[in-house]
Amino acid sequence: IGTIFFSLIHIPLYVKKTQGIKFKFNPSWPDNIKKIFTFKKQIFDNLFWSLFWGVPIWTAYEILSFWFYASGIISFIKFSDAPVYFCIITLLIPAFRDAHFYLIHRFLHFKFMYKIAHSVHHRNINPGPWSSLSMHPIEHLLYFSGVIIHWIILSHPFHATFHLFHAGLGSANGHIGFKQMLLNDKLAIDLSNYNHYLHHKYFEVNYGNLMIPFDQWFGTYHDGSDEMHHKMQLRLKNKI
């Protein structure tokens, strides 16, 4: 499913280039040939880290969760037993994921973690859809580890599955590189999160997403404006 999902975005925008650079955050195209990338090409690099590490680790978490449920190691609740509670857990998953992502992302920006793991993802200064899960396996283990909450609290296999798919497919939101995709001359769909694009551009801003305003609270928010850019420069200068 992930392969189909990312391909449906990547092919029209980056292979066929059906709308050129219209609505693209960065008017340049990703670096196709660069020594820093695995196999010296961004798309090959992204496919390798996503498909050979990301998808297997995602799958391993899913299989382990199902095995725990099936073997009775962890209990689960049925919708018919507590429909309100079931729905509340479902609705809280995006918020929990937001908090979990912010915490692990800050951890990944610690110098030693960045060097051994997160630098793989940050090769993509000009990201595309396949950059979403292009991570070192250590980062994949942390990124998908949010599902462990369902091994602790009473939930259902549906919640674990939804959580993992929300993480896996939802990662595209900040990496597509286009604000909108044109379906025809009059119709377009919103695609990407400018907030995370700026993180790839400047590194030291927008560690979280927008549901919970962690970056506003901790002074690392950047909205692309000159004012916020100046604040970022002052913060980094004082940090030095």
Language-model features: locations:
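Non-catalytic, topology-defining segments of multipass membrane proteins
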Residues: 1-108, 116-119, 123-145, 151, ...
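Active/binding-pocket-proximal capping segment
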Residues: 110, 120-122, 164-170
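Alpha-helical and His/Cys-centered functional microenvironments
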Residues: 109, 122-126, 179, 200-203
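Functionally important transmembrane alpha-helices
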Residues: 153-212, 217
